[in-house]
Amino acid sequence: MAVAKKVERDHNNFARGRSIPRFQRFFGFLRNSSSPPPSKPGQATIPLGQTGTMTSTLVLLRHGQSTWNLENLFTGWYDADLTDQGRAEASAAGPAMAAADVAPTVLHTSMQTRAIRTANLALDAMDRLWVPVRRSWRLNERHYGALQGMDKKETTEKYGKDQVFEWRRSYDIPPPKLELDDPRHPRFDERYASLPADVLPASECLADVVERMLPYWYDDIVPDLDAGHTVLVVAHGNSLRALIKHLDAISDADIADVNLPTGVPIRFELDDAMVPTKRLALTARYLGDAEAAKAAAEAVARQAG
């Protein structure tokens, strides 16, 4: 019963989060049609007499290189920390944002150490450790099920390139599940103790990540953007790919070709409907050294498995 209520609540929140901001904006316009809307910190304003929309800034940042990234292991929900290179990438993300005149006023992260540490290092480099922080398991990396902890190259040799590519990059085919009593199952991690075991994933495809991420987007991140915040989301390759798929309306097939470099901020300017104001290639949204970021993304694509 608890699980059923949890799922029902999430679906209700999803629908409510999708409709309320537009509802409020519409009736807010009717109430204040004789005067321009109040300006919001961090948002561009439209001078009186001109038409247009206010924009919100969203920055997505994949965590810096982790120890299991370096070892080419399927990481998933394992709580790998950053390597020295990963710490350097995270620290460099702060100046990259500052150079682009991006100053986050609220932070959202997953519950995993590599994302949390990346966020702290990036904000510390900007002298902005004070910004409010919200964390959610819904921003966690995709759970790789029974593949978690396995070497990607060895997994390819064992199961074949096509099978591993299907597990890794297909939109709706998850890897084999973990058994409930497997010590790798997230129910044994105290940070998820308040969640029912049946809600916690034992394996996920990207479609599953989209489904569990979107309620958090609508109910927690969108309200911060609506309030005028410059929002920084520090998460993982697949949870951020899920969000980018939603923002850029990428097809189920084409999302397989999207690869995110570690430690590179990606900026989106969104209109009041939370749609990107410009259709840009992802590489055009990178902050910092765009060529280095592109090379890093290509390296991700070449990983075995």
Residue ranges with predicted function:
Residues A2-R22:
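Cationic, amphipathic, low-complexity segments that mediate targeting or membrane/lipid association
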